[in-house]
């Protein structure tokens, strides 16, 4: 009886080799080729289409004799043109009609009516256009398998970092999504249906609350400068007022696209889903005081700063979205006041946000009620944003310190 070694680590187990779609397709083709249990009826039942046969006329008699190089090239080009017309299934009469039509020559030997000749020319044009369409189609193996976009992504990920045989690529291809006509009204059917359903749900939610939800129209800015002031505040406030005066209850939140060199303003987007506000008693149960925040080593030097209307939020969880901040701070929105501006940061400043309130009193109230709240497992730390003068003063104080003998020392130089 064999002894089983229970001390073998998981890393020592041999991983099962993954079979890709190309290898699976190649194996099925091989099994189909080696299968000998095939009857004559099955072979006959398979439909096979072949290209129609054409007449081959060797190029030699016309080129016999002495001629210049330019004459030979012209003769060879005409012969190639005639051969391509024969591949379309045209007979000699139709080839003659087409050549005379292209060259503009009138042949007296053709005794057909102009209507019949025009009909034949239209038929030839259709054959030529159909051949061009077929030639433009992608050339694929007859047994190649069509994969969806997700299957193609999985297939590419399996080959990541390894060499792939080139012939395996011919065994599958990605399906192309159908092209939508821009002028087709059916393209907007899904958007119209979604907007109608969400509007009805918001109206029901508004009736249940018993208050106008339009007063909570909140606008978040797209980017923040180093001083903590919003870019284009007048533009945001105007759009927020227009949204508040509208008929439908909507929440406007701007979206930020992070680029390596600069940031672009994309305008406000509409949140049509109802947002549930977090109750105040739940916030009080799940928040830390300022002393408890200072007991955390990371925030031992926590200081709220000088009160102003801009709050700086940090230590945000990556799961926090705009709607989460709205559920916390929308309670401080005044019915007839300007909208609160939310600015979610991305890139290197991910996990931070700036909130601009109508005045510093509301900002102070929001800080003392929400600061220290545990949101998605992380403590939300709030401070008053610093102006440019305060930031420069803090930098100077951190670089310049006074020695006991009155000399001035510069740290970090």
Swiss-Prot record:
SMART domains: RRM. Gene3D superfamilies: 3.30.70.330. Residues 225-247 are annotated as: Disordered. The keyword Ion transport does not apply. Keywords: RNA-binding. The lineage of its organism: Eukaryota, Metazoa, Chordata, Craniata, Vertebrata. It comes from the Eukaryota. Residues 309-387 form the RRM domain. GO terms for molecular function: RNA binding. This is RNA-binding protein 41. InterPro entries: Nucleotide-bd_a/b_plait_sf, RBD_domain_sf, RBM41/RNPC3, RRM_dom. Transmembrane segments: none annotated. CDD domains: RRM2_RBM40_like. Pfam families: RRM_1 (PF00076). Signal peptide: none annotated. May bind RNA.
């Amino acid at each position: 009886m064999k002894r089983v070694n229970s001390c073998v680590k998981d890393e020592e187990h041999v991983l099962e080799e993954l079979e890709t779609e190309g290898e699976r397709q190649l194996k099925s083709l091989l099994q189909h080729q080696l299968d000998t249990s095939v009857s004559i009826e099955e072979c006959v039942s398979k439909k096979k289409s072949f290209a129609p046969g054409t007449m081959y006329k060797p190029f030699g008699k016309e080129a016999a004799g002495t001629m210049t190089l330019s004459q030979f090239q012209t003769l060879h080009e005409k012969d190639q043109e005639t051969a391509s017309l024969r591949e379309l299934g045209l007979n000699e009469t139709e080839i003659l009609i087409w050549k005379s039509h292209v060259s503009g020559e009138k042949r007296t030997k053709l005794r057909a009516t102009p209507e019949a000749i025009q009909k034949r020319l239209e038929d030839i044009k259709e054959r030529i256009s159909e051949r061009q369409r077929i030639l433009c189609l992608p050339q694929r193996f007859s047994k190649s398998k069509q994969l969806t976009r997700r299957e193609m992504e999985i297939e590419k990920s399996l080959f990541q970092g390894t060499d792939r045989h080139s012939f395996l690529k011919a065994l599958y291809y990605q399906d192309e999504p159908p092209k939508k006509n821009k002028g087709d009204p059916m393209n907007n059917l899904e958007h119209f249906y979604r907007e109608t359903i969400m509007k009805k749900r918001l109206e029901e939610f508004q009736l249940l609350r018993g208050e106008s939800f339009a007063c909570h129209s909140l606008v978040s800015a797209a980017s923040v400068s180093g001083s903590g002031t919003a870019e284009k505040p007048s533009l945001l406030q105007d759009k927020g007022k227009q949204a508040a005066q509208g008929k439908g209850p909507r929440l406007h939140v701007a979206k930020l696209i992070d680029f390596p060199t600069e940031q672009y303003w994309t305008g406000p987007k509409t949140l049509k889903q109802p947002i549930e506000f977090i109750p105040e008693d739940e916030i009080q149960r799940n928040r830390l005081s300022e002393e408890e925040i200072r007991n955390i080593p990371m925030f031992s030097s926590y200081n709220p700063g000088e009160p102003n209307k801009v709050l700086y939020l940090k230590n945000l969880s990556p799961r926090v979205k705009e709607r989460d901040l709205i559920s916390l701070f929308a309670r401080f929105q005044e019915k007839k006041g300007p909208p609160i501006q939310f600015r979610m940061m991305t890139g290197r400043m991910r996990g931070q946000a700036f909130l601009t309130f109508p005045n510093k009193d509301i900002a102070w109230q929001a800080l003392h009620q929400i600061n220290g709240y545990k949101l998605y497992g992380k403590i939300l730390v709030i401070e008053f944003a610093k102006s440019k003068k305060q930031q420069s003063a803090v930098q100077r104080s951190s670089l310049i310190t006074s020695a006991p003998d009155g000399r001035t020392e510069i740290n970090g130089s």
